[in-house]
């Protein structure tokens, strides 16, 4: 049954302060990552690091997501606007975050943190990889609630009519008028793939279940990080076929998107890590030692 999107993106208004669902989804993602990360620390999945050390790591990773995501968006998707007005970088309230930029930010933060704590960088990445899909899944749900990053038109019964995705002059009509037209079936031809939910399922739920299961037992170094890069790259590349291209423009061949191009290096990187993992040492959990000297 085709659905008419009428969810208010603002969850709560306190005078001039508006709390958006997208921000709440980010908070839920980070909270879930913090709780499950502490559980993994207690199980000895990152030897030499306690709960406080992990909290520091997650804090720097959060900074990496925000800074890298914003800078990446401006460089990958809005370079012309950024060069014309560099101050746009700081207008985060206008939206615009890039996963690939956020990933680079997280990698940079984890590299710095690992070097500071004298840990192998990829041990840190293998530890963090199962936690990232939590943020991805909640973030994509936030995209759906905010009616952004919608997909292409579909005649499937699971399609969604996004008022902001309607062509002119329909997108100028008030909400009540659009709902009345939707009730007659007049807007069914404008139903779109809920690509945000596809990504929430694949990049969020599926990746979390797989990576959590693999990382829950002794495994070779590079394996979990390699699976993360490969799976995300493949899932993102596939979903891009039913997702509207960023800025409505294809990069090449009238089908290749910028998101797909940015995913290709991830796929290659993931394959390289998986090959490297075959000769890498097997990582065994080491339970933290208590004050009494017993694990």
From Swiss-Prot:
Q: Which of the seven top EC classes does this enzyme belong to?
A: transferase
According to its UniProt record, where is this protein located?
Cell inner membrane
Transmembrane feature ranges:
17-37, 57-77, 92-112, 127-147, 196-216, 222-242, 255-275
Q: What is its main location?
A: membrane
Q: Which UniProt keywords apply?
A: Cell inner membrane, Cell membrane, Membrane, Transferase, Transmembrane, Transmembrane helix
Does the record's keyword annotation contain Transmembrane helix?
yes
Q: Where does a 1,2-diacyl-sn-glycero-3-phospho-(1'-sn-glycerol) bind?
A: 140
GO BP terms: namely:
lipoprotein biosynthetic process
Q: Under the GO molecular function aspect, what terms does this record hold?
A: phosphatidylglycerol-prolipoprotein diacylglyceryl transferase activity
Please give the function described in this protein's UniProt entry: Catalyzes the transfer of the diacylglyceryl group from phosphatidylglycerol to the sulfhydryl group of the N-terminal cysteine of a prolipoprotein, the first step in the formation of mature lipoproteins.
Name the chain's protein. Answer: Phosphatidylglycerol--prolipoprotein diacylglyceryl transferase
Naturally occurring in which organism (per UniProt): Stenotrophomonas maltophilia (strain K279a)
